[in-house]
Amino acid sequence: DIILWGSQLFCKPAGHGMAVPWHQDGQYWPIDPLATVTVRIAVDDSLPENGCMRYIPGSHKPRSVVAHEFVEASNVAIRQQVAELDESLAKDDALYAGQISIHDVYLIHGSSENRSTKRRSDYAIRYMPATSRYVRDPAFPANAYAAKTSQLMNYTWRPLWLLRGTDRAGNDFDIGHGRRAA
């Protein structure tokens, strides 16, 4: 019972790719109950020198979203970060082109700027169990946050695909796919 609910290309150009503050994806996504996984495929080598993803090992185990705070900076890709964090625990998630990593919605992660001469690009694919509901209500906290902070993110119209099994949560698989031919 698996739903594909999103994919995204992340690209940090050589010499100026933005930093991504420490965060948990669950802070932003309209899924209830919150259960999802991201499969990240390295398009380019994703190494410390070009801003690879970093993570806090075990931070997903409490199964809760920790407090995030607003970031007052213009050189970051997202404007929120985990409020309290021991960065000395961080590990690099270095990948070579073609390798993958998988991370949980509760994992605390981020990345530094790309100050190298090489681009860093990853393709992320997001899955959720068909026992969770993708919430399209604009008042749901993740949707309200996206509407307030980004003209590019409108989670209420995102298409879903039931890849396997049975939808057990009443998800709408018609929204976001455009008109169907008669």
Mark where each language-model region is:
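Short, surface-exposed loop/helix-turn segments at secondary-structure junctions
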Residues: 24, 73-89, 119, 137-146
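Double-stranded beta-helix
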Residues: 46-112
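A short beta-loop-beta micro-motif enriched in histidine and acidic residues
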Residues: 25-36, 88-90, 95, 118-119
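Non-heme Fe(II)/2-oxoglutarate
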Residues: 100, 106-182
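Conserved double-stranded beta-helix
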Residues: 1-54
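Feature marks short, surface-exposed loop/turn motifs that line or immediately flank catalytic pockets
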Residues: 13, 47, 62, 129-131
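Short aromatic-enriched loop/helix-cap "lid" or pocket-rim segments at secondary-structure transitions
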Residues: 17, 52-53, 65-68, 134-139
